[in-house]
Amino acid sequence: MLWPGVSAGGAPAGNRLYYGDNLLILSDLLGDDCVRGKVRLVYIDPPFATQSAFETRSQSHAYEDLLAGANYVEYIRERLIFLRELLSSDGSIYVHLDQKMAFAIKIIMDEVFGSTNFRNWITRKKCNPKNYTRKAYGNVSDFILFYTKSPRYVWHRPFREWTAERGAREYTYVEKPTGRRYKKVPIHAPGVRHGETGKPWRGLAPPPGKHWQFPPRTLEEMDSRGEIHWSTTGNPRRKIYLDNSKGVPVQDIWLEFRDPHNQNIKITGYPTEKNPDLLRRIINASSDQGDLVLDGFCGSGTTLAVASELGRRWIGIDNSPEAIGTVLRRFARGLEPMGDFVRRQRLVSKRARTSEPPTLFEDWTTDQGVPAIGSRVRMIRDFSLFASEPYSGELKRYIEDWQRSL
């Protein structure tokens, strides 16, 4: 059912928030022509088979993670099969896991998506170093498995900005007239060619077993622009300028996206909340504006909020009423900024000072008169909330809180 009074737009393939069993909802979406084969990106952060129950900051029950072993693997496999059918032919899926089940789920993903469509095993630093008392190395990482539905997929390579130190180390030369930093690279490549790139240029033949990277006419144009460096022995090399570089290509180890609760910063309080900048990287890399993004375990709604911020449409699913309530709070109050802070700030609510019970939508500020971290408020109203019986009755309190907060 569509919850009455909650939809504020919600075109057939627009933003949708579902409350219920994601297996049943994914199955239903297979019959929706606006969704099947139209999802450009899937990100899921499923339970990690911890056999634990999780609570929010206010001690509200959030969800249980009680599956393990073969039952857990089958639970994920069933959902991956449906998610593959919902993906577009050029779509991608990212599955976020920890060390317990990542290896088992990779085998399942090889089966469902094909081993040739495996792209990356991404290692993410999730927290600060730990002082472990047990005999093992500190567990500070988790993993993201990146697969695509086919060899042709949307991909916008992410880059990190050059630091001054690294730029000076890799681009070691400075062009005197302009002050531009550059490095020198060969203008030849392996392999013999008998066309234009195999002919002499300026009286120089390519080195044995090699060919010029560019035809002689292109090399002439480059030289006329000052882009060829000639050594004292007459050896030509190409100048590559730092200011023409897009940045440092991102690799498969991500150190900058620790979880919010490991950064002592203002968050929603949901136990599995992910860093918004992590989702920004994934969404920007594997989708375009207007594309449909799906999160089948949407939790605190980070994926949905970031997708809206970046101009994507989205579908979010969760079977926890606390999760849906947290999503609505986030939609009403906006994303909080991520960042590192040297000094710990104990977060308390204004209501806590008066001994009143906290609510999901209350205003959280820092204690001891420290100003609250500025909020990047972006209210999200263009979505529809769907809940099937018998689930819908559990949402009443959260819906009413959300509507009062608008």
Predicted regions and their residues:
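S-adenosyl-L-methionine-dependent nucleic acid methyltransferase catalytic domains
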Residues: 1-151, 233, 240-406
